[in-house]
């Protein structure tokens, strides 16, 4: 009887460890995906004072097809 109780407790502990590990891995995947979306998101327009030809050519908004040019009036 004592062995069955110990086995049941160990089984429950193992199941909890599996559930916690799965949740942590899922959270890591979500964090990576959210970070990727944040990196791909468009930045606000660059102020006219900082607007250079290099920034127009290499800005995030210019390179991504779904974004408008950052420096529209360079």
From Swiss-Prot:
UniProt site positions, description: Key residue for binding both Kv1.2/KCNA2 and Kv1.3/KCNA3 (occludes the channel pore like a cork in a bottle): 61
GO MF term list: potassium channel regulator activity; toxin activity
Range of residues in the leader sequence: 1-22
Record-annotated ShKT domain positions: 42-74
Keyword DNA-binding recorded: no
InterPro entries (alphabetical): ShKT_dom
Protein name, entry field: Kappa-stichotoxin-Shd5a
Keywords: Cleavage on pair of basic residues, Disulfide bond, Ion channel impairing toxin, Nematocyst, Neurotoxin, Potassium channel impairing toxin, Secreted, Signal, Toxin, Voltage-gated potassium channel impairing toxin
Compartments, as annotated in UniProt: Secreted; Nematocyst
Gene Ontology CC annotation, any one: extracellular region
Disulphide connectivity of cysteines: 42-74, 51-67, 56-71
Function of the protein: Inhibits voltage-gated potassium channels (Kv) with higher potency for Kv1.1/KCNA1 and Kv1.3/KCNA3.
Family named by the database record: Belongs to the sea anemone type 1 potassium channel toxin family. Type 1a subfamily.
Prosegment residue ranges: 23-39
Site feature Important residue for binding Kv1.3/KCNA3, where: 46, 50, 59-60, 62, 66
